[in-house]
Amino acid sequence: MSSSLFAPTIETIDYPFPPKPVPLSDAQKADYKARIKQLLIEKDAVLVAHYYTDPEIQALAEETGGCVSDSLEMARFGRDHPAKTLIVAGVKFMGETAKILSPEKTILMPTLEATCSLDLGCPIDKFSAFCDAHPDHTVVVYANTSAAVKARADWVVTSSIALEIVEHLDSEGKKIIWGPDRHLGSYIAKQTGAEMLMWQGDCIVHDEFKANALRDLKSVYPDAAILVHPESPASVVAMADAVGSTSQLIKAAQTMPNERFIVATDRGIFYKMQQAAPGKTLIEAPTGGNGATCKSCAHCPWMAMNGLKAIEASLSNSDKTTHEIFVDEDLRVKALIPLTRMLDFAKTLNMKVKGNA
């Protein structure tokens, strides 16, 4: 049984949700896609998109020889691809991770305003002070963090390898600081028995899944398997037939015998999940329930900012200040250390690291 301790609660953040991109007509979409395809060739660029972006963006990445995956695989694909420029359709920390692994490349994003509640909820000054107050602890941070927070950490982990790394550190008798996702941290502590001092951040999408409403939905579809990302509350995770990272949930939909799945993660994943399990029915897990309203409604508002118009602008604008990612070199070198530590650990386990981030 774990005896996890919690960090002092940081003040509640009222996240400023961005406006959604203006819907485009089919003709406009076709024009933007054609223009983007041409610009990718002209600029020696490749498009990498996260599982949580809109389906048409994921499809465009696939059509143009790019990549659709989690943030770390996006960064690794970009590092290993010969293109000199990477267009990262995702949120800002993903662009930073790509820059950390590919400092010599130009990293562009459709918008630098696309952020993440986990990143916003873990400001480096407060997190660093918290770590300084517990110098005997090993600092483990989730990949969904800023370059500065990664640079302050001993280990960076994705959701698919977090259990193994925490288990390893616990077996060595290490005390652990975990940040920033409290739900994922609680899940790991419960699974491993490790004592973890936890930062109190959460993902606005996963935090909204409701156990009571999920129970009601399950009664409507009793034959459906419930797939849950561990950034969800413990009450939701407890109902899962499979818990895992984005890649692991896609694999579960593909391999489990059920014909129906209730999916508790960002609905952007349905595009690749349906590809992997073409004959199966995917149902969104409820984020409201009992008259409650949802804020994110199972889709990250910042991921939704990655529209065709913004991607075209990132490639065509001569002024890159609103699109290009820069990471201070000293910070980059420091952040690369815990990232490399994770990748090396994964090699010893002979596993390919995929996570949510």
From Swiss-Prot:
Disruption phenotype: Required for growth on defined medium, and on defined medium supplemented with nictotinic acid. [4Fe-4S] cluster binds at residues 116, 203, 300. It is found in: Cytoplasm. GO terms for biological process: 'de novo' NAD biosynthetic process from L-aspartate. Iminosuccinate binds at residues 50, 71, 142-144, 159, 229-231, 246. Pathway: Cofactor biosynthesis; NAD(+) biosynthesis; quinolinate from iminoaspartate: step 1/1. Keywords: 4Fe-4S, Cytoplasm, Iron, Iron-sulfur, Metal-binding, Pyridine nucleotide biosynthesis, Transferase. Belongs to the quinolinate synthase family. Type 1 subfamily. This is Quinolinate synthase. It comes from Shewanella oneidensis (strain ATCC 700550 / JCM 31522 / CIP 106686 / LMG 19005 / NCIMB 14063 / MR-1).
